[in-house]
């Protein structure tokens, strides 16, 4: 995607010539993936606010970071947190959340880190629950994202897991690596270890 989250995490250069030189070294790394049925994600899957942003942004003509920020502002003014039931490796949690991100790698893209300690090859997904927060704390939430300290926010809860079931009240968008889709109000996610080799 335009945020290059996975590429940035893997250290793949954004410069085309440098990226080609890296490819020509032919050094590969194995990474995990998250699976929802037959669909895979390699970076982050999300439900809630970020999925609503992805859904809206997909239909926007104004792209790039500025367009994305504009979409965030438009969505956040009307967005309401939802109630979720999560089953993470057999333990059940009930949460009212602003959004839930299931992270294979630490960042969305553009160096915004939602799960600072996530790893693409540890055989685990990090379930990041962003609780309802006062709007006046939004600047601090953004600071945490770009300072790699989201896990230190009192409004963020991170639970590692291999098998995850998320049930939400009503219908709401879901995204897999930024691509919006509708998979119903209950999704089952599991990690598949060492699923893909990437030349980086």
Where are these regions (language model features)?
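Catalytic core of DAGKc-family lipid kinases
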Residues: 1-98
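Hydrophobic alpha-helical segments that either span membranes
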Residues: 2-6, 100, 128-130, 138
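A residue-level signal for conserved active-site and pocket-lining positions in enzyme catalytic cores
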Residues: 34, 53, 100, 127, ...
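Short beta-strand-to-turn element immediately C-terminal to the catalytic PLP-Schiff-base lysine
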Residues: 36, 54-56, 102, 130, ...
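Glycine-rich phosphate/pyrophosphate-binding beta-alpha loops
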Residues: 46, 50, 101-115
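Short acidic/glycine-rich loop or secondary-structure boundary segments that cap or lie
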Residues: 50-53, 94-96, 108-111, 135-138
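Gly/Ser/Thr-rich active-site loops/lids in small-molecule metabolic enzymes
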Residues: 59-67, 116-136
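ATP/nucleoside-binding phosphotransfer catalytic cores, i.e., glycine-rich phosphate-binding loops
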Residues: 88-89, 94, 119, 129-200
